[in-house]
A protein has these predicted regions:
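Short beta-strand-to-loop junctions in surface cap/lid or active-site-entrance loops
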Residues: 1-11
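Short, proline-enriched alpha-helix->beta-strand connector loops that line the catalytic pocket
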Residues: 11-12, 147-153
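Serine-dependent carboxylesterase/thioesterase catalytic core
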Residues: 14-20, 25, 34-147
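Conserved strand-to-loop "acid loop" that flanks and positions the catalytic carboxylate
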Residues: 20, 155-159
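Short amphipathic alpha-helix
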Residues: 29-30
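Generic structural hydrophobic/aromatic packing signal, biased to beta-strands
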Residues: 141, 153-156
Length: 159
């Protein structure tokens, strides 16, 4: 599945980031609900390769999609679902996305890690390994939350 970008005159754009085993189709119902009310809308297809793609690499790809669709300076709102929320935070906190983001929504994302990532071998599934409790990536993200205080953040999680 390819990247999907729907445009209109209203701003700011909304970027939706899918999770580990998902595609942009996971947002079809949300897209229908937003029809006509929230555009431009960008839903990039990130090649997560069942967790083989490192999370930072996915965040770099996300940044490339955002820049290609909206340039370098257009403010955006960002919503990440599941692993997409962690990918979004990497882009925000480690790759400069905070400077252009107005709001960040994390839905069902393992921001503190998940035990389900433990059994997978790190050398093969580095993206999944990044989601382990206490991983170097999550420690780095959670060790410096000051930048997130400059934007409106919402986290929704259910266990």
């Amino acid at each position: 599945l390819g990247e999907e970008c729907v445009t209109s005159d209203s701003a700011p754009p909304l970027v939706l980031v899918h999770g580990l085993l998902d595609t942009p189709a996971v947002f079809n119902a949300l897209k229908r609900e937003l029809a006509g009310g929230r555009h431009p809308l960008l839903i990039p297809a990130l090649p997560l390769r069942l967790g083989r793609t490192p999370t930072m690499e996915a965040a770099e790809l996300l940044g490339g999609h955002i820049e290609a669709a909206f340039g370098r300076d257009q403010p955006i709102d960002l919503l990440g679902f599941s692993m997409g929320g962690v990918i979004g935070r990497c882009w925000l906190q480690l790759l400069g996305g905070l400077g252009r983001t107005r709001r960040f929504f994390s839905v069902g994302s393992p921001q503190q890690g998940t035990l389900t990532a433990r059994p997978w071998p790190s050398r093969v599934f580095s993206g999944i390994a990044d989601l382990r409790n206490g991983s170097a990536l999550l420690e780095r993200l959670n060790g410096d939350l000051d930048g997130l205080q400059r934007i409106e953040c919402h986290s929704f999680y259910s266990a």
